[in-house]
Amino acid sequence: MATIEINYHNIKQNAINLKKEAKDIIAVVKNNAYNLDLKECVKIFSEAGINYFATTKEEECKIIRETLGEEVSIFLLNPTRDFELVRKYNIEVNIANLDYLKENIDELRDLTLQLEFAGSMRRAGAKTLDEVLEIINFCKENNLNLKGFWSHFSFADEFDGFYEKEKELALKVLEEALKIHDFEVVHLQNSASFLRDGAFEKTTHQRLGIILYGALPYDVKQYPVALPNLVIKNPITVYGEIVNIVDLKEGECIGYSNAYIAQKDKKVGVVNIGYGEGILRDRLRGNTCIINNEEKDIYATMMSHLVVEISEKEKIGDKVFLYDDIQQLHDYVKYFGPNSVQLAALNYNSLNVKKIY
């Protein structure tokens, strides 16, 4: 059975290293902590000194509270109408827009609120500076507890000029908002924004997700980094093993629909891992794996198997690594998009899971 090793010690060290660079951290733990186990991750983040968490689901807020107790702050990124739950578990609520406030004012009077500026993401929040100011004034007039201001950059991992524009707008809106309200918490930056710019002066926290889990949000070899001393450790190792060695004659094929045709007589390895384990096909097709510390081509991909290049020294039982310290998750962003796509796809029902502390 193919194996995934999750190194929680490395995730904790990432949190420690990031805390040294940030003003303070709100750890994003949405979708089961990027599919790396919500309870495990919030425990180690808490041990690393992080006491503020954000997620998109009410049920995950409940789990965080039950796991860590009353000493931590929890922010629900999505607007909610489950006011009974957020009240019971002391969850901070996101303001969807001015209408949301007006429609639910009686439910919101005893809750803690955060104001989102929609920016260019536009999933929720105030769309204009005027709406931001209206919301602030509405909260003041109605004695609502407005604690935070936040936004989310949709172009922070792009280097085509759009990020600079959305950043400039968000900072201008924040500057105007601060003239009429003293926010206890201000968080604008995600992992990519923080990595390329460092901490913004007028923020109190950096809201970090993917970088906590060991994946860099863009190609740091090609694009600038504002945190040159930051060390991020890889927590994910995924491997199968060679379960059969097949001799192919020149012109013979292996796999579905002539997936690979031998150009000469050769041996190939059959490996007990495929896209059924949640490894994205774009990661596999035309790419490489590591066997005995050497890079080898992947010839064919199947749901439960790979066919890979081998030499005479490879043997049945040898491990075949798809993700490790040599080939890390972020090395494949150019093939399949955000790192979170791969993390979310991992199929733990088909993998032997080893946890390292």
Protein language model annotation of sequence segments:
Residues 126-127, 196, 243, 310:
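Short beta-strand-to-turn element immediately C-terminal to the catalytic PLP-Schiff-base lysine
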Residues 2-6, 10-13, 23-178, 182-185, ...:
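Active-site-proximal beta-alpha core segment in soluble small-molecule metabolic enzymes
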Residues 160-264:
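Anionic-ligand-binding alpha/beta catalytic cores of soluble enzymes and soluble regulatory domains
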Residues 245-357:
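C-terminal accessory subdomain/extension
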Residues 1-3, 133, 137, 224-234:
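Short aromatic-glycine motifs in intrinsically disordered, low-complexity regions
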Residues 31-32, 153, 191, 210-211, ...:
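Active-site metal-binding loops of divalent metal-dependent hydrolases
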